[in-house]
Amino acid sequence: MPKPIRRIVTGHNAEGKSVFLSDEPSRFEFNVGRGAVTVTELWETRSSPAENFGSEETVDHQFGILPPKDGSIFRIIEYLPDRQRMGEGYDREAAFRAMGAEHALDRANPRHPGFHKTDTIHYVIVLEGEIYALMDEGETLMKAGDVLIQRGTNPAWSNRTDKPC
């Protein structure tokens, strides 16, 4: 089980001064695929440019993999080691269905059951541990501090260690 993610949200008071609106562990944690992946939603925007006034919670819905049209999602994902995550009884169809992403699943790629494609951009930062980023052609090992800019590609993630990433 991952440690709670502290989420601090700022905003404005009635006089337009900057203030802290909340400072607490994120309440929006979702377990996908028998708990093999834990997703912590931190913030969501629903337009661009983002609406920065008001104090409403933006992560107030059921988990889904895609952001709203013209919006963005900031999340932290923890991957268990592959042998735990995709061990006996792993059902990738069910895992992607739980994320509302069965349409993104690449059923034709035999290299890894996690291959999927969306037309979104992802900024992937490894905070702890290590994980392989797999593309249709090639793979690279990412370690803590590494950043990957994923531009509408067909990725899969492989944690070949014995610790979560």
Language-model features, listed with the residues they occupy:
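Ligand-binding loop in jelly-roll beta-barrel domains
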Residues: 69-73, 80-82, 132, 139-144, ...
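N-terminal leader/capping segments at the start of a protein or of a new domain
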Residues: 1-58
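Conserved short histidine dyad/triad with adjacent acidic residue
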Residues: 26, 75-118, 151-155
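A short beta-strand-loop-beta hairpin characteristic of the jelly-roll/cupin
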Residues: 110-144
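Short, charge-rich binding segments
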Residues: 64-69, 115-116
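Terminal, intrinsically disordered low-complexity segments enriched in charged/polar
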Residues: 47-64, 73-78, 86-89
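Short, ordered coil/turn segments that flank beta-strands lining enzyme active or ligand-binding pockets
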Residues: 14, 127, 160
